């Protein structure tokens, strides 16, 4: 599992891959280590789709990454308390599932006029909106198999969240998932779940915008 929080404590990501997701997995005991996400991401992106990636930790506390047959990297580990950060325990009132392509399009549509996405749900529909100096946009989806594949709302809920953070995680996950599942309650952190094929899942938590 991998867990990381941004410096401003606005976003938290929690990734869980079972050992069955790997071709080969060996771990003699619990090990905690920290890496710089920006550096680690750049390194992993050097791999082609056909490349195998092997990750080890050396005796001198270095992360060893082998890409394919001829690329070998060493990365210095860092002290990190992110893995000890407890996950938010929130009783969510609303849950919606949207195809990843539709969710990406919604973010792009709202970003034309706003830096924030407001999400509202009732028992039968989800509403995505944004407002800025140049104008406003409102997008309503009703449950159907093509776009809004699931909606479950115990009570009407609404929350406003940063598009900068949302766009970053959607671009990072890319086309590896078909559906994006969002859970939230009014004025509470948003939780987005991505299920990556049959390999594992990613949970992304995002604090709501606080009106001053």
Spans of model-derived segments:
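DNA polymerase sliding clamps and clamp-related checkpoint/processivity subunits
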Residues: 1-112, 120-212
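Polyanion-binding surfaces on beta-sheet-dominated domains and ring/shell assemblies
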Residues: 117
């Amino acid at each position: 599992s991998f867990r990381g929080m941004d410096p401003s404590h606005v976003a938290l990501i929690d990734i869980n891959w079972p050992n069955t997701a790997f071709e080969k997995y060996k771990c003699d005991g619990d090990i905690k280590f920290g890496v710089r996400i920006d550096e680690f991401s750049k390194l992993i992106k050097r791999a082609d789709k056909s490349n195998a990636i092997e990750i080890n930790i050396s005796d001198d506390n270095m992360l060893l990454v082998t890409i394919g047959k001829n690329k070998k990297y060493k990365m210095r580990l860092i002290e990190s308390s992110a893995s000890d950060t407890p996950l938010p325990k929130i009783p969510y009132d609303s849950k919606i599932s949207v195809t990843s392509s539709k969710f990406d399009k919604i973010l792009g549509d709202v970003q034309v006029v706003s830096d924030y996405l407001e999400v509202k749900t009732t028992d039968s529909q989800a509403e995505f909106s944004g407002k800025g100096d140049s104008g406003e946009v409102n997008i309503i989806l009703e449950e159907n198999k093509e776009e809004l594949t699931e909606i479950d709302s115990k009570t009407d809920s609404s929350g406003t969240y940063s598009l900068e953070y949302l766009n970053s995680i959607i671009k990072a996950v890319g086309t590896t998932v078909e559906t994006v599942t969002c859970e939230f309650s009014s004025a509470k952190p948003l939780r987005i779940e991505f299920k990556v094929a049959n390999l594992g899942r990613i949970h992304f938590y995002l604090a709501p915008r606080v009106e001053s």
